[in-house]
Amino acid sequence: METLSFEFPAGQPGRGRALVGCVGSGDLEVLLEPGQPGKLSIQVQTSVNGSASRWQHLFERLFDGQTPPALLIDIHDFGATPGVVRLRLEQGFEEIGHD
């Protein structure tokens, strides 16, 4: 089990909170809540040791060319594929975008 932390430049804080997925379904749970302006902070708890570079590359591809909202994101991973990670993050971003 490993805990990884990542930070990326961001815009203004997101408007809401969201919980998408669950560890037992797709092997991934993502919690999103408003963060500090200008900073997107991500904490990943994963069962896959030595996966920091995979996570770093996934986030870099996801945020490339855009300014995400300032959020605190907690990810609980039990071996999800990169496609599932991206899907859950996109679902979370959509959820916090609704009024």
Swiss-Prot record:
User: Does the keyword Transport belong to this entry?
Assistant: no
Q: Which GO terms describe its cellular component?
A: cytoplasm
O-(phosphoribosyl dephospho-coenzyme A)serine: residues bearing it? S25
Major location category of this protein: cytoplasm
Alphabetically ordered keywords of this record: Cytoplasm, Phosphoprotein
Q: Name one GO molecular function term.
A: acyl carrier activity
InterPro entries, A to Z: Mal_deCO2ase/Cit_lyase_ACP (IPR023439), Malonate_deCO2ase_dsu (IPR009662)
- Report what the Swiss-Prot or TrEMBL entry states about this protein's PTMs: Covalently binds the prosthetic group of malonate decarboxylase.
Where it sits in the cell: the answer is:
Cytoplasm
Q: Give a yes or no for keyword Glycoprotein in this entry.
A: no
Source taxon at top rank: Bacteria
Purpose of the protein:
Subunit of malonate decarboxylase, it is an acyl carrier protein to which acetyl and malonyl thioester residues are bound via a 2'-(5''-phosphoribosyl)-3'-dephospho-CoA prosthetic group and turn over during the catalytic mechanism.
HAMAP family on file: Malonate_deCO2ase_dsu
Indicate the family of this protein: Belongs to the MdcC family.
What name appears for this protein in its UniProt entry? Malonate decarboxylase acyl carrier protein
Species of origin: Pseudomonas fluorescens (strain ATCC BAA-477 / NRRL B-23932 / Pf-5)
* Upper classification of the organism: Bacteria, Pseudomonadati, Pseudomonadota, Gammaproteobacteria, Pseudomonadales
Report which gene this protein is encoded by. Answer: mdcC
